[in-house]
């Protein structure tokens, strides 16, 4: 059995320090949220930041510290009523799926979202209408995951 950890729950100020500490604590696999372990990484800019060079660096560090990325986090609101933000969110998921494959991640993780701009839990989150909206909005992400040979984990 392998025991993993959310990488941002380890001490460190950059990806390498977090990975080193995960290894020293006895973990062999990690959940990576880039914005929490890479200084200056902003999720809003992920499509531009998740480059081949960064993937090579991350994959090299994972290998150096004998870690496996089980899950690459991309917890953005797929149910936002802001359609311009939704288009950017879709680009972000696609970038995470591509990047995840390049670093050897098993899956990209997400949540079902909230039908509001603030991404806040509310009674409407638990309605049939919200579920239908999520299912419709996640379809292209699932298709891209299949194209990349990745899994999409939904919390």
Which stretches of residues belong to each language-model region?
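Short polar catalytic/cofactor-binding loops
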Residues: 7-15
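Hydrophobic faces of well-ordered beta-strands that scaffold small-molecule active sites
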Residues: 2-7, 30-32, 69-74, 108-110, ...
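Glycine-rich, proline-tolerant flexible connector loops at the mouths of alpha/beta enzymes
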Residues: 31-57, 112-120
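Residues that cap or flank secondary-structure elements
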Residues: 9-10, 50, 88, 133
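Glycine-/proline-rich flexible loop or hinge segments
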Residues: 39-45, 73-81
């Amino acid at each position: 059995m392998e025991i993993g950890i959310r990488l941002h729950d380890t001490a460190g100020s950059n990806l390498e320090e977090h990975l080193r500490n995960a290894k020293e604590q006895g973990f062999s696999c990690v959940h990576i949220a880039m914005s929490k372990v890479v200084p200056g990484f902003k999720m809003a800019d992920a499509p531009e930041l998740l480059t081949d060079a960064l993937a090579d660096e991350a994959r090299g560090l994972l290998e150096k510290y004998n870690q496996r990325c089980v899950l690459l986090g991309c917890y953005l609101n797929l149910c936002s009523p802001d359609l311009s933000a939704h288009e950017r969110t879709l680009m972000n998921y696609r970038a995470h799926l591509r990047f995840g494959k390049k670093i050897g991640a098993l899956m990209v993780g997400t949540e079902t979202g909230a039908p509001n701009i603030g991404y806040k839990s509310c009674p409407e989150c638990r309605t049939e209408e919200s579920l239908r909206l999520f299912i419709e909005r996640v379809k292209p992400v699932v298709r891209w995951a299949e194209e990349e040979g990745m899994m999409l984990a939904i919390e």
